[in-house]
């Protein structure tokens, strides 16, 4: 038996560029600014404006209270929860809600996947509203220069360019994102600090007393808190990008980013208190800019919005790629536009996001209305992350008191934010909730349907069929089907095989081959695992290969099997030269043919109403995906797909023979005639 474990099969074409940035260095910190903080770094564009539009009376206590809420939200939510706690809950260096779920999947909980798909679906919904609100707000800054400029057409043009360039990758321009975001954050901090000097008393906002006063005495505290929450919406993206930059780089960069953000928020607050009568009609972000810098500020804001949008789009591709390997989402065509590791492009998702962003811009028309749609979905994502972090801390043996304190504190905080954001439901929050709800339904149906499909796959012990497979190979009266016949085996148990696979070899059309290969695909909980183990079941005849693939790795079975075979040939465990004399004499290897057993749901089976509904939706959802050969990265020219029915709860009813009844009737007729 040949058993080669821990065999790395990484493609040589991929460059692990991102991994080099995990080391603490100026370059690593610069890259982190460009990748991680785009979303949270553009929040000053609209947070203070959203607070002013809540209808609360604008006075010192209101502004100090709102700013205090912002400072302590960034501290409690972003710094403590995400930077100090969540970044330590990494899955071999990867972060994000699905990576966290993959760590917990081994707990065998029947419902924990629900938390993961709720969080993932709402995070994806947030990814549609973010490009719309950031780019629109940035372009609205032009109204300070020329009120007649067409904001919507300019915004749509920029959005179109952002999504169009995805197909080419962003490797060339991505290197400059870090430098640009460094300049952006310096602009935020310097302009904010200058504005603070006009109203130094604004520094009292560091005292949480003012936040408590606002939340206990203001009748509009719910609306204000909903607007305040927008300052931390990028925290979840910060956790998701852990694998790109590393925990230490993110932690150090956050200290700089947080300082610049707070300076800018305080500067906006100082300007508002100095211009109370006119503050409601303008965006304080652009108002604190010197008139001579206004055009420069709009250009910088637009650039920062583009960086934030790019990060959200790339993040969406990564999340869905993980969801595919975790069996939360149908397999879709994935492209790699550059050689940078982890940079993906999913054409259908890119188009769907583009249409969604355009519709949101056309529906809400301006950033003030978009603010109502923003924040609700991501609050739910954060709440799901808190629950999963609680399970993670418990699984790691963290003191029960600390785990309960953590979960209790953050569930309470996020439940309050959720309640505050629900007040915006009718004003626009319904939009992202609708998108998130549709995505959740699709993921839930896909997970349940996949479980049903696996449950009704009948398996048989493979060792019972060693002899007959060997006999078929030796039977020259059977036409040779292929030199090497490869099956993808979906049986979960070790040593078992899908009965339809055996039926294909033995019964349907006996298939003679020189070598039979059974491939098992095991998607593991770690992100970048790419290993295989191989067993020789019948020498020179039957082989079983198990491929262990991480949830961030795209399956490419043809490529991986070729590397497995090369290893076997090099170790002289198998002779792959063609058995045809003319080809063998010239050292030509035998051909390969793949057979995929595809089960098609049979509606007439005796499935209950719930199963029938799930499978019907599953069939509909599967149409957005690609077929299994393409999903597995197979060369479709050498693939045969055999379709068999998937029958649930089959109840066979015997057909009754009526020959004797017919004979009796004929006898009676004859007697009547007599």
Question: What do these predicted regions represent?
Answer:
Residues 2-674:
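The structured alpha-helical core of multi-pass membrane proteins
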């Amino acid at each position: 038996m040949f058993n080669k474990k821990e065999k790395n099969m990484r493609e040589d074409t991929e460059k692990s560029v991102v991994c080099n940035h995990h080391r603490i260095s100026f370059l690593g910190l610069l890259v982190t600014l460009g990748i991680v903080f785009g979303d949270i770094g553009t929040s000053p564009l609209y947070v203070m404006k959203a607070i002013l539009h809540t209808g609360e009376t604008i006075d010192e206590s209101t502004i100090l209270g709102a700013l205090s809420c912002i400072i302590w939200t960034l501290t409690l939510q972003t710094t403590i929860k995400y930077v100090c706690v969540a970044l330590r809950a990494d899955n071999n260096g990867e972060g994000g809600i699905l990576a966290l779920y993959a760590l917990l999947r081994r707990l065998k909980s029947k419902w924990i996947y629900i938390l993961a798909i709720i969080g993932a679906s709402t995070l994806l919904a947030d990814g549609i509203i973010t490009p719309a609100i950031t780019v629109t707000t940035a372009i609205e800054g032009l109204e300070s220069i020329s009120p007649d400029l067409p904001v919507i057409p300019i915004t749509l043009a920029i959005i179109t360019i952002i999504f169009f360039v995805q197909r080419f990758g962003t490797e060339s321009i991505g290197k400059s994102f870090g430098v640009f975001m460094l300049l952006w954050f310096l602009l935020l901090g310097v302009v904010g600090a200058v504005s603070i000097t006009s109203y130094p008393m604004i520094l009292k906002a560091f005292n949480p007393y003012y936040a408590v006063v606002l939340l206990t005495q203001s009748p509009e505290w719910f609306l204000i808190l909903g607007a305040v929450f927008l300052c931390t919406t990028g925290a979840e993206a910060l956790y998701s990008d852990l694998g790109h930059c590393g925990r230490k780089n993110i932690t150090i960069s956050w200290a700089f980013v947080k300082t610049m953000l707070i300076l800018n928020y305080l500067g906006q607050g100082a300007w508002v208190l100095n211009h109370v009568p006119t503050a409601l009609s303008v965006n304080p972000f652009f108002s604190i800019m010197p008139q001579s810098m206004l055009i420069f500020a709009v250009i910088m804001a637009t650039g920062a919005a583009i960086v934030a949008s790019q990060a959200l789009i790339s993040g969406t591709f990564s999340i869905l790629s993980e969801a595919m390997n975790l069996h939360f989402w149908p397999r879709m065509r994935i492209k790699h536009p550059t050689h940078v590791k982890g940079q993906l492009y999913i054409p259908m998702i890119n188009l769907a996001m583009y249409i969604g962003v355009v519709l949101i811009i056309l529906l809400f028309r301006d950033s003030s209305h978009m603010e109502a749609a923003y924040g609700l979905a991501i609050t739910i994502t954060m709440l799901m992350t808190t629950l999963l972090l609680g399970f993670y801390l418990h699984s790691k043996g963290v003191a029960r008191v600390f785990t309960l304190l953590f979960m209790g504190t953050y569930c309470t905080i996020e439940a309050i934010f959720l309640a505050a954001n629900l007040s915006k439901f009718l004003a626009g929050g319904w939009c992202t909730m609708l998108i998130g709800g549709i995505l959740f339904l699709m993921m839930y149906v896909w997970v349940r349907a996949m479980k049903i499909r696996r449950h009704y796959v009948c398996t048989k012990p493979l060792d019972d069929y060693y002899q007959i497979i060997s006999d078929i190979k030796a039977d020259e009266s059977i036409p040779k089907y292929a030199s090497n016949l490869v099956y993808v085996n979906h049986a979960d148990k070790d040593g078992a095989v899908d009965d339809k696979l055996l039926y294909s070899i033995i019964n349907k059309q006996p298939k003679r081959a020189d070598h039979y290969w059974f491939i098992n695909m095991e998607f593991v909980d770690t992100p970048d695992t790419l290993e295989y183990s191989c067993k020789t079941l019948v020498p020179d005849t039957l082989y079983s290969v198990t491929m262990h693939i991480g949830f961030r790795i795209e399956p490419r079975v043809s490529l991986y099997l070729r590397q497995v075979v090369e290893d076997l040939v090099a170790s002289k465990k198998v002779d792959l030269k063609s058995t045809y004399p003319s080809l063998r004499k010239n050292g030509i290897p035998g051909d390969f043919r793949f057979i995929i057993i595809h089960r098609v749901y049979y509606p007439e089976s005796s499935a209950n109403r719930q199963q029938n509904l799930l499978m019907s939706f599953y069939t509909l959802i599967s149409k957005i995906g690609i077929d299994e050969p393409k999903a597995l990265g197979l060369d479709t020219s050498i693939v045969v797909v055999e379709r068999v029915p998937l029958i649930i709860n089959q109840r066979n009813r015997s057909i009754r023979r009526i020959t004797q009844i017919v004979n009796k009737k004929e006898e009676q007729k004859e007697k009547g005639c007599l």
